[in-house]
Amino acid sequence: MAALLGIVSPVTFTGKHPVNSRSRRRTVVKCSNERRILFNRIAPVYDNLNDLLSLGQHRIWKNMAVSWSGAKKGDYVLDLCCGSGDLAFLLSEKVGSTGKVMGLDFSSEQLAVAATRQSLKARSCYKCIEWIEGDAIDLPFDDCEFDAVTMGYGLRNVVDRLRAMKEMYRVLKPGSRVSILDFNKSNQSVTTFMQGWMIDNVVVPVATVYDLAKEYEYLKYSINGYLTGEELETLALEAGFSSACHYEISGGFMGNLVAMR
């Protein structure tokens, strides 16, 4: 359940993606810096906590998210809020050495972890990944540039979700999909209770061992402030997507939004 936080970050990248020629004014988003600090702080233990708290299930959920994206061999794809790189690595296996993966995150510490992990992997497809520090609500890419976009545990932490969805729509090619994995904000009281109980009695106590209790207490707050599956579908349609469907997975604890441009 650490993947539950949905973290992102930047480091020594394989290269900076050239900013497009369109003049785009950067806007400072309230609270984004505080969230960046939080994600930077947990970066060193993020992967270990993901495995421990989810009992390894986060790997299954991430594989599902990548499959729903429709990414295939030779594609140029984007992983937003890439964190330590799990989804980006899975995407690279889909697109192969003839494809390209961009992993973007606003946390430099998370990106540093991702770059280190990449350097230790032997498969040639992992060389097609490029890491870039950036903001999900102001993407440094051209219109209609990507064949697929993924986001794992990121939208919940974005201050302006509609703007982020509009940016994903903008950079996607027509007919392509975005796949967004995150905690599910359930309408079922039992599921909501169990989520809260797990965070209070499992996640936070384990995080306390790593001196990260306050950072992981944020998780419960962020889920409460997130959107239900139906609200996420509405958000995607409002952003311009032609269709959207939210899937509840892992007993309703997690959810995945799939939207088609």
Curated annotation (Swiss-Prot):
GO biological process: methylation; phylloquinone biosynthetic process
Subcellular location(s) per record: Plastid, Chloroplast
Extent of the transit peptide: 1-30
Molecular function GO terms recorded: 2-phytyl-1,4-naphthoquinone methyltransferase activity
Keyword Methyltransferase: yes
Gene Ontology, cellular component aspect: chloroplast
The keyword Ligase belongs to this UniProt entry's keyword annotation: no
PROSITE patterns documented for this protein: SAM_MT_UBIE, UBIE_1
Family, per entry: Belongs to the class I-like SAM-binding methyltransferase superfamily. MenG/UbiE family.
Biological function: Involved in the biosynthesis of phylloquinone (vitamin K1). Methyltransferase required for the conversion of 2-phytyl-1,4-beta-naphthoquinol to phylloquinol.
Protein name, UniProt field: 2-phytyl-1,4-beta-naphthoquinone methyltransferase, chloroplastic
Organism: Arabidopsis thaliana (Mouse-ear cress)
